């Protein structure tokens, strides 16, 4: 019913430039970013779908990406994670650095992400709500113990990955601490995300098509709370002309321009003072 109601929403989304976005952010005191897979595309992470090189073109999502597949073949999801960690040089990109800069300047207060790659934390953002979990954590299916992982531990040659699925000292098996198809997002995390959005005076929706219900519902929540919404995406999305006030046609990495404008303005103000 909620998505049906959203489909009937109408709003005139205006196209703006990065310079105009900088002016909008400069007037704000509590900015929240909602990010999706588009923010990781420039970090050499393959997309899940939509290309011949996508993850689900190589691995059957019914086996490798669902909770039912995990219970039947628990080693399969670990194979995907191991292969991606070993075969791709994954690093933070300029967009991640830009968000970290916006936080250090006092504008950005939190990041709500659908990504599981941990790149926002790696770039220096201190308050990150990872709705779909974090691939750098493993949770035991028996005792619920959570183990922190790193890039080395996820490599093919690591002790942790030498036998799949990895086993907990209690005898149980580890599952990546991420949301698989068939699982639901934690209600506590959704509540935390809504609380952050309720406090914001600007929501940046970056690199997400907003077709996943989690993102759509959070944007709808912001819309109902009359929050200003700006999309940063290379194309229009599901919420364009429905919920967003502005749309910036840009790659995630191009946010560097916004960060530099605001950083320059901040330094200029310090000199005047």
Swiss-Prot record:
Active site: 132
Entry keyword set: Chromosome, Metal-binding, NAD, Nucleus, Telomere, Transferase, Zinc
Swiss-Prot/TrEMBL cofactor(s): Zn(2+)
Reported regulation of activity: Inhibited by nicotinamide. Inhibited by surfactin, which is a competitive inhibitor of NAD and an uncompetitive inhibitor of acetylated peptide.
Binding-site residues, Zn(2+): 140, 143, 168, 170
Effect of deleting the gene: Loss of binding to telomers and subtelomeric repeat regions (TAREs) and promoters of var genes.
Protein's UniProt name: NAD-dependent protein deacylase Sir2A
Species: Plasmodium falciparum (isolate 3D7)
